[in-house]
Amino acid sequence: MTSRIVYLGAPEGFTALAEVIAGRAKLEHVEAEPTAVAEALFDASALLDASMKVYIDDGMIAAAPDLKVISCATTGSDHIDRGEAERRGIPIHTLREDRELLQNITPAAELSWALVLAAARRLPAALAHTREGGWTRENFPGLMLHGKRLGLIGCGRIGGWMARYGQAFGMTVVGYDPFIDTWPEGIQPTGLKELFESCDVISVHVHLSDETSGLVSAPFFS
C-alpha cells in the first residue's frame, strides 16, 4: 500500500517536495482550512505542515488512524495539540532539530528589526498621514536608535541576529534568557526586571510554551 502524505503550504513548496518524493508516496496538496485538513488526514501516513494556518487538534489526530509522523516547517509547534500525538507515539519534527540549517536563516530576525524601525520612526502613522495628503514631518519625530538601549528577551538564534543589528545601529544590547549557557557576542546578560526598567526598545524572541506563557505581563509596563 502506497503511503499518503498531506502537505499544507505554498504551491512552490509542494512542487519542490514532489520532486524529492518522486512518486515513492502519494502526495496531496490540501487547502489550509480545518474541515479540509481533517478530511484529508483520515487515511494519511504523514502530515507536512508548511502553513501553520490550521490548529491541528486532538480530534484531527485521533481520527487519523494511519498517521505516523508530523513535520513542520517552523521552529515552534504550538499550532499542534500534542496530547493525542504523544499518546500514539507520533513524533512531531520541527526545524529546531537542524541548528546548522537554521543558523543562517534570517527572515524572522529581519522582519523583527523592520518592526523595531517602523515603531521607532512611527512609520505606520507617518505613512497614513502622507496618504491623506499631509506632509507635517514635525508630527513624527520618532526615536533615534543610536545610543539607545536594546533589551532582548530570548537570546538564541534570532536574538543573536537582533543583537548584531542593534550594535550596527550603535545601540547597547542587553538580554534575558535563563535557558542558554553561551551568550551571543555583544549581549550583556541582565535580569528581566532590570531589562524593562532600563531599555528604550524591547524585543521578545521566545517560543510559546507552558514555561514562557505570561513571561511578559502587565506589571512590567507599570
Sequence positions of predicted segments:
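Phosphate/diphosphate ligand-binding glycine-rich loop within oxidoreductases
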Residues: A46-L127
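Glycine-rich NAD(P)-binding loop of Rossmann-like domains
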Residues: R99, A126-W161
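Short loop/helix-cap segments at secondary-structure boundaries that form the rim of catalytic
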Residues: T15-A22, A38-L41, A62, I80-R87, ...
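Aromatic pocket-lining residues of Rossmann-like dinucleotide-binding sites
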Residues: G166
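Short acidic/histidine-rich motifs immediately flanking catalytic phosphotransfer sites
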Residues: A40-A46, A64-K68, S198-I202
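Rossmann-like adenosine-cofactor binding region
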Residues: V54-D57, V174, P178-S222
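N-terminal glycine-/charge-rich "phosphate-binding" loop or analogous flexible N-terminal tail
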Residues: M1-S51, G170-V174
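Short, well-ordered coil/turn residues at beta-beta hairpins
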Residues: L8, A50, A73, H205-L208
